[in-house]
């Protein structure tokens, strides 16, 4: 959803398959709002996916992307990077963040959070994105959001409210859950929103082949 529910969103997202049974979910928030921010965030995702498909390790791909943003232009532009890499064979997920909002993992009886204190891509030349690995099980849901989602909720209660929304719904379809969360945030928070808002949800299920 774009700022004011009308403008073009500066957020971009993508889900794609990588060799070796890996699946990526990437969410990027470009600086500011509107078309320029959208181009910036879309470019970050496109380049990261190309580097990963070419076989570069994720840390190397992020470093190259950051260098391109820092050195490639005179005007200051930066984008957050929130990436989840799912190993479809082991159930492990690597969460890599640069300036991104928390990720919420919905378990059977609790919500876990993945945080980042790393700066966004394009701010400093030497950047090491933060990485956390978690083992996921069937039924888990991974909820990724841009900061506009949290900023729309009452100050000091953002994460608590989102926890309650995620935990309190029986919705298991990722697409439906993403739409539900956006709708509830608009109901409970600032409407129209003062920043772009994006929710990206991935569900984990065991599939047995006979």
State each model region's role.
Residues 1-12, 62, 66-72, 101-133, ...:
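PP2C/PPM family metal-dependent serine/threonine protein phosphatase catalytic domain
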Residues 33-54, 136, 140-192, 208-209:
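Active-site-proximal, acidic helix/loop segment immediately C-terminal to a metal-coordinating Asp/Glu
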Residues 202-208:
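Short beta-strand-to-coil "C-cap" segments at the C-terminal boundary of structured domains/repeats
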Residues 38-108, 186-195:
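Catalytic core of PPM/PP2C metal-dependent serine/threonine phosphatase domains
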Residues 29, 100, 145-148, 196:
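DG-centered beta-turn motif at the end of beta-strands
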């Amino acid at each position: 959803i774009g700022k004011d529910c009308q403008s073009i969103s500066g957020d971009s997202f993508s889900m794609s398959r990588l060799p070796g049974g890996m699946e990526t979910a990437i969410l990027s928030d470009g600086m500011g709002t509107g078309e320029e921010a959208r181009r910036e965030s879309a470019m970050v995702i496109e380049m990261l996916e190309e580097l990963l498909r070419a076989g570069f390790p994720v840390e190397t791909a992020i470093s190259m992307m950051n260098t391109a943003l820092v050195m490639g232009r005179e005007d200051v532009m930066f984008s957050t990077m929130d990436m989840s890499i799912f190993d479809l064979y082991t159930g492990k997920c690597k969460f890599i963040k640069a300036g991104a909002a928390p990720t919420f993992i919905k378990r059977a009886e609790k919500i876990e959070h993945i945080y980042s204190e790393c700066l966004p891509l394009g701010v400093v030349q030497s950047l090491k994105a933060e990485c956390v690995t978690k083992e996921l099980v069937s039924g888990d849901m991974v909820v990724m959001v841009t900061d506009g989602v949290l900023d729309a909720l009452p100050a000091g209660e953002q994460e608590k409210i989102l926890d309650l929304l995620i935990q309190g719904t029986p919705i298991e379809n990722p697409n439906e859950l993403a739409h539900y969360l956006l709708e509830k945030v608009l109901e409970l928070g600032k409407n129209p929103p003062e920043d772009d808002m994006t929710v990206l949800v991935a569900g984990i299920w065991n599939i047995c082949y006979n």
